[in-house]
Design a protein with these regions (language model features):
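Conserved mixed alpha/beta catalytic, RNA-binding, or beta-rich assembly cores of soluble enzyme
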Residues: 1-190
Length: 190
């Protein structure tokens, strides 16, 4: 941050002592002159985890399970950033509410984050149809046409197979369709 004194410079100086800052430099403070701070933070990877079909008609809720797992795995290496509920087309064989979930993380260790999430999902899912897909990267827009198709109607196995190379399929139950479809809608709440 660079500015002419005031609150912005003060805020950046305070942030330099925050947990997780690797290194910082700060200009001498003083009003009426240009000053600032530079912070170095660890580089984290964006990881999106889509899940679907974790419940049964009688119990459970995919959105709750996803949130609880995401909170449980958050630590100094992995930050839980967001949780998006994605409304899907109401296929007749859905488990309950026709929604899939995508959780967003910023992590220093994407493989460990995905492994831990998967282990907890396998332990706590109530369905043998659960799907889990992982996308590591900043821009999942290549999955958007598939995601929109799943929101508008049923898709074929061939359509699912075309997008599989874009994700890491971790649990391959029937819910994999919704799990993959949810990923490009991360933080798109419209």
């Amino acid at each position: 941050y660079r500015g002419l004194g005031g609150g912005g410079v003060g805020a950046s100086i305070c942030r330099s002592s925050a947990r997780g800052v690797i290194r910082s430099t700060t200009d001498p403070p003083g009003g009426g002159k240009e000053a600032g701070s530079t912070l170095w933070l660890p580089r984290r990877s964006r990881l999106l985890i889509g899940i679907d079909d974790t419940d049964t008609p009688e119990e459970g809720a995919t959105w709750t399970l996803a949130h609880n797992i995401a909170r449980a795995i958050a630590d100094d290496k992995t930050r839980y950033l967001s949780h998006t509920i994605v409304q899907l087309y109401p296929v007749p064989y859905r488990t309950k509410n026709c929604v899939a979930i995508v959780c967003e993380f910023a992590t220093l260790d994407p493989a460990a984050c995905a492994d831990t999430f998967q282990a907890l999902l396998e332990r706590y899912t109530l369905s043998d149809k659960t799907g889990m897909a992982v996308y590591s990267g900043f821009d999942p827009s290549g999955l958007m046409p598939f995601g929109r198709s799943v929101k508008k109607g049923e898709v074929t196995a061939a359509e699912v197979d075309r997008v599989r190379p874009l994700v890491d399929v971790r649990m391959n139950g029937r819910g994999i369709v919704g799990a993959i479809a949810a990923i490009p809608f991360s933080t798109r709440y419209d």
